[in-house]
């Protein structure tokens, strides 16, 4: 069946023919605290990119459900979730090193042992390092919406990406997205609804209430005060 949702050009393996990145590298200046965290805590919690598949039990030293978060920003929500769910393991990916440093600092302060972080392009990590059928959940919160129509192709949520995520989820695993940009929420819903093997967990077949497991960010709180909406989508891998 032809899928009518617009996507960048991909080959038969789902890899981009020309790499369209969904992010812009804005490295920014590291604070002394972030620099200290990268130097001292990366050796313990950091994961270098490689072309070898990760062994999660070896990485975390135990067998436990694994959640992958893509684009964790400064890491406040990711650290809070890892702290609240010590029985689960978390891998966060972020391309901006100040955010990685901030996350490492917070995770160290909380004494977390169930969190690992990467500083790399998430699509490459998914292709090269995440084993199929290995993740309990994939989280994508507030990705860049690329507001202008001519930039919509840069949005990370496209059919090949959603198919790739599905292949990494276990059966029954969840892909959880959130955005504060309604046109992007509609785009996400269109993309996800077009793919065989996903089930929308919304009772109204569109959006779900924010689950208690997703912390409200400071950015989100400010948006609520200004009357801005937030849309959560949760899709389960069914086959």
UniProtKB/Swiss-Prot annotation:
| Keyword Nucleus among record annotations | no
The protein's UniProt keywords, in alphabetical order, are: Methyltransferase, S-adenosyl-L-methionine, Transferase, tRNA processing
Q: What class of enzyme is it?
A: transferase
For binding S-adenosyl-L-methionine, which residues are annotated in this chain's numbering? 69, 94, 121, 144
Pathway(s) where this gene product acts: tRNA modification; N(7)-methylguanine-tRNA biosynthesis
Q: What is its EC number?
A: 2.1.1.33
- Subunit architecture: Monomer.
Q: What is this protein called?
A: tRNA (guanine-N(7)-)-methyltransferase
This protein's species is Escherichia coli O1:K1 / APEC
Q: Which gene encodes it?
A: trmB
């Amino acid at each position: 069946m032809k899928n009518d949702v617009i996507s960048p050009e991909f080959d038969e393996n789902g890899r981009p023919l020309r790499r369209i990145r969904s992010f812009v590298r804005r490295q920014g200046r590291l604070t002394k605290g972030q620099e200290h965290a990268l130097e001292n805590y990366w050796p313990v919690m950091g994961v270098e990119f490689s072309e070898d598949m990760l062994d999660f039990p070896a990485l975390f030293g135990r067998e436990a459900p694994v959640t992958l978060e893509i684009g964790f920003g400064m890491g406040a929500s990711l650290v809070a979730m890892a702290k609240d769910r010590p029985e689960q393991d978390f891998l966060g990916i972020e391309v901006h090193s100040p955010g990685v440093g901030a996350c490492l600092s917070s995770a160290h302060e909380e004494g977390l042992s169930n969190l690992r972080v990467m500083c790399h392009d998430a699509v490459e990590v998914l292709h090269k390092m995440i084993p199929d059928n290995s993740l309990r959940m994939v989280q994508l919160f507030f990705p860049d919406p690329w507001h202008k129509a001519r930039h919509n192709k840069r949005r990370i949520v496209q059919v090949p990406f959603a198919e790739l995520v599905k292949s990494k989820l276990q059966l029954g695993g969840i892909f959880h997205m959130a955005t504060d940009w309604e046109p992007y929420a509609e785009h996400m819903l269109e993309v996800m609804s077009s793919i065989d093997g996903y089930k929308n967990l919304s009772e109204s077949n569109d959006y779900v209430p924010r689950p208690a497991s997703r912390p409200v960010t400071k950015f989100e709180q400010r948006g609520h005060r200004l009357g801005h909406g937030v849309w959560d989508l949760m899709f389960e891998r069914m086959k």
